[in-house]
């Protein structure tokens, strides 16, 4: 699509979203647009530090868990001694960026608002890891904590998956993987999905939206996909294009959050419409005036805090 034909997104976003966009971090170096992935990861981690301060304090523990690919780092947040359930959180970042630190505040707020134990899984990033390694690491971590629940003082009788952006795809893909392969890790009570991608290759919002402000141009999306997938056939896998999976039965209750000016918004709309058409429990909420990745900015945006509260309330309502 000719760039001039796209919507003037930065003129249309909400006042609080504009404040975020215009927030400068003087000590931050320029984004290494032509740099290596390692340099981009370093920048992303530095940039997110500002947005992760002043998060709720609670007991937190770090553990490494075994998988067939090696050990994976996890971080457990304990908001209370007797948690009613455990939520596994998968961070976003286009499969190539992000870690437990970049999403620490999100996980702490989710634990605080739900009063459920939250476990962040630091799955191996792409292109070092190719599909479906990240999903298999997530499932392995889930199984490990299910088997060792007493040792870690967690309640694994009821669990959930949550994630933002690429992490939302991993969250739903992991839940479907457990269902399809009949793996018992406790009852999956719900899945919380913030502005994810679920398999669309083109859409109205992908044409009208996306730019340098969100890193979601058509070229960006292609780059993330090429880094994540092992081969062309993976594009049609039911654990990458989730619309190729069976969404007509036994899908855990899904909270689907969309950002108004997100090029991935149609993925969320289609997921909701598909699940609702087949009487699968789901809820969709659109957050007006927001860009992709707005969940990070709860330090400054009431809407981001609201979206986290909404997801937490949806999950606890399923327990």
Curated annotation (Swiss-Prot):
Keyword entries, A-Z: Cytoplasm, Hydrolase, Serine esterase
One annotated GO molecular function: carboxylic ester hydrolase activity
Entry keyword Hydrolase: yes
Motif Involved in the stabilization of the negatively charged intermediate by the formation of the oxyanion hole, residue numbers: 91-93
GO CC annotations on file: cytoplasm
EC numbers, comma separated: 3.1.1.-
Keyword DNA-binding (UniProt): no
Main location: cytoplasm
Locations listed in the record: Cytoplasm
Stretches assigned to coiled coil: none
Active-site annotation: 165, 262, 292
Assembly description: Homodimer. Interacts with MalT and MelA.
Family that this chain belongs to: Belongs to the 'GDXG' lipolytic enzyme family.
PANTHER family per the UniProt record, alphabetical: AB HYDROLASE SUPERFAMILY PROTEIN C4A8.06C (PTHR48081), ALPHA_BETA HYDROLASE FOLD-3 DOMAIN-CONTAINING PROTEIN-RELATED (PTHR48081:SF8)
Function, as annotated: Displays esterase activity towards short chain fatty esters (acyl chain length of up to 8 carbons). Able to hydrolyze triacetylglycerol (triacetin) and tributyrylglycerol (tributyrin), but not trioleylglycerol (triolein) or cholesterol oleate. Negatively regulates MalT activity by antagonizing maltotriose binding. Inhibits MelA galactosidase activity.
Record-given protein name: Acetyl esterase
Organism field: Escherichia coli O81 (strain ED1a)
